[in-house]
């Protein structure tokens, strides 16, 4: 379980979302969409962030990024520390987000990345060592052996 999730633990779910507003009314405009993607957050609206499960905290962190209008979302390791059943829900939510904005996903779990991304970049020691589509990646036995054999 990660030590840190990008939420305010003492604030309620509502307050965590409200704090992300850039303009008055941002949350009111996005609230229904957020609850369609993350229905658990509606039920937990008055709960403190610190009382949410790890998966719910991840959902809240992503939901907070949705409050202002963004054309690009950077989502870093959304599956880290989550149970498989929670990961499935998170992946479904991220798929829905791609209709609203471009998503740059950083993910070490190959199964998750392979189901969400249409382009891939493999980074080693801070350098891009491969970029392309899944067929490009799978066409290289050397890349499969080096980077995916343990996936």
PLM regions and their residue ranges:
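ABC-type ATPase nucleotide-binding domains, specifically the catalytic core motifs of the NBD
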Residues: 10-29, 39, 132, 148-151
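ABC ATPase signature
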Residues: 11, 51-52, 65-66
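A short, proline-enriched helix->beta-strand linker immediately N-terminal to the Walker B motif
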Residues: 66-71, 100
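Catalytic Walker B motif of ABC-type/P-loop ATPase nucleotide-binding domains
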Residues: 73-77
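Helical segment within the ABC ATPase nucleotide-binding domain
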Residues: 87-100
């Amino acid at each position: 379980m990660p030590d840190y999730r990008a939420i305010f633990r003492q604030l309620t779910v509502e307050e965590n979302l409200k704090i992300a507003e850039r303009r008055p009314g941002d949350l009111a405009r996005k609230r229904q969409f957020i609850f369609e993607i993350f229905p658990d957050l509606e039920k937990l609206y008055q709960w403190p962030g610190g009382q949410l499960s790890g998966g719910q905290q991840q959902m809240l962190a992503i939901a907070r990024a949705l409050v202002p209008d963004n054309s690009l979302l950077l989502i870093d390791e959304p599956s880290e520390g989550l149970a498989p059943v929670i990961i499935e829900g998170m992946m479904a939510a991220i798929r829905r987000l791609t209709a609203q904005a471009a998503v740059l996903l950083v993910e070490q779990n190959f199964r998750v990345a392979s189901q969400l991304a249409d382009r891939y970049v493999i980074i080693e020691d801070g350098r891009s060592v491969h970029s392309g589509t899944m067929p490009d990646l799978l066409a290289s036995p050397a890349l499969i052996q080096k980077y995916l054999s343990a996936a």
